[in-house]
Amino acid sequence: MPKPSVGINGFGRIGRLVLRAAVEKDSVNVVAVNDPFISIDYMVYLFQYDSTHGRFKGTVAHEGDYLLVAKEGKSQHKIKVYNSRDPAEIQWGASGADYVVESTGVFTTIEKANAHLKGGAKKVIISAPSADAPMFVVGVNHEKYDHANDHIISNASCTTNCLAPLAKVINDNFGIIEGLMTTVHAVTATQKTVDGPSGKLWRDGRGAGQNIIPASTGAAKAVGKVIPELNGKLTGMAFRVPTPDVSVVDLTARLEKPASLDDIKKVIKAAADGPMKGILAYTEDQVVSTDFVSDTNSSIFDAGASISLNPHFVKLVSWYDNEFGYSNRVVDLISYIATKA
């Protein structure tokens, strides 16, 4: 089977890291990129140099209106570059892009993302939560994808991708009565470097580098969409903290069946070594956030940081590289849906 041909709309943090993940995994072929705000020579620079994940360990250049990305031992990607503001005008079909990653953060509904289909794309994967597109978390509910009807789908959020695999393992083994999630979350591009206006969410406009900022997140409620039996049982919030990358989920849950912390560790380790390998990982090391920069897993359970009050009430801690782990799942989701074409 030929590799799926992919287009990327929006060459920001996620767009660029999806391309890095595509090069590394060598499982999809990126054939087009669109970004109205970045010239092709600037794309080369932004892709080559990354303050968080380091310099790209390969070659990147441009020839005419094509980006040329290569890495030793991997396939070369010859990528047509577009600079269109209107997604309906991007000629995805002409460049052969069947699957479009919508990573601008702007076109996150079925109606808005549908514009990509007009340019010849067959499927759109939104790299953000969506109000109405079906959400899939690889390793949790990706097998519910329906090729005949699901043309615009969401890869959910980075936090949902961390929480859902953990919640699935716990719920499958012990049952979750209810739970509260907190994510201690790295800064993202929407935050301000210094205090500034921020619409209705005044706290969000405070300086990202000097504050711990309480914020809302739909990530926990979204788990109820990908694991229907947990619908209405989870909610959560976020603290934005002054670190550039890597976040951590704290899930505090009440369990139906009694379980010791050792019982919980055993089932998570079994899932991490077995059916969820590459999605969920397990560590007993004395780790901190920077140890997970560029980690490709969705969720890394921290056995040493997790605690139990009693056999029915536990606090479970799981790390995630909110940029790179997530970008790898975008590529995995495309690889999976391509097998259903």
Curated annotation (Swiss-Prot):
Indicate the annotated site residue(s) for Activates thiol group during catalysis.
Answer: H185
Endpoints of the signal sequence:
none
User: SUPFAM superfamilies, alphabetically?
Assistant: Glyceraldehyde-3-phosphate dehydrogenase-like, C-terminal domain, NAD(P)-binding Rossmann-fold domains
Which UniProt key words apply to this protein? Cytoplasm, Glycolysis, NAD, Oxidoreductase
Keyword Membrane part of the UniProt annotation: no
Kindly indicate whether the keyword Membrane belongs to this entry: no
Binding residue positions for D-glyceraldehyde 3-phosphate = S157, C158, T159, T188, T217, G218, R240
Q: Which GO terms describe its cellular component?
A: cytosol
Q: In which pathway does it act?
A: Carbohydrate degradation; glycolysis; pyruvate from D-glyceraldehyde 3-phosphate: step 1/5
- InterPro entries named among the record's database cross-references: GlycerAld/Erythrose_P_DH (IPR020831), GlycerAld_3-P_DH_AS (IPR020830), GlycerAld_3-P_DH_cat (IPR020829), GlycerAld_3-P_DH_NAD(P)-bd (IPR020828), Glyceraldehyde-3-P_DH_1 (IPR006424), NAD(P)-bd_dom_sf (IPR036291)
Biological processes annotated in GO: glucose metabolic process; glycolytic process
Q: Where is the active site?
A: C158 (nucleophile)
Q: What EC numbers are recorded for this enzyme?
A: 1.2.1.12
**MF terms (GO), sorted A to Z:** glyceraldehyde-3-phosphate dehydrogenase (NAD+) (phosphorylating) activity; NAD binding; NADP binding
Q: Which reaction does it catalyse?
A: D-glyceraldehyde 3-phosphate + phosphate + NAD(+) = (2R)-3-phospho-glyceroyl phosphate + NADH + H(+)
Q: Where does NAD(+) bind?
A: R13, I14, D35, R85, N322
**UniProt subunit comment:** Homotetramer.
Q: What else is known?
A: There are four nearly identical glyceraldehyde 3-phosphate dehydrogenases in Caenorhabditis elegans.
Q: According to its UniProt record, which protein family does this protein belong to?
A: Belongs to the glyceraldehyde-3-phosphate dehydrogenase family.
Q: What is this protein called?
A: Glyceraldehyde-3-phosphate dehydrogenase 2
Q: Which organism is it from?
A: Caenorhabditis elegans
Give the taxonomic lineage as stored in the record: Eukaryota, Metazoa, Ecdysozoa, Nematoda, Chromadorea
Its gene is: gpd-2
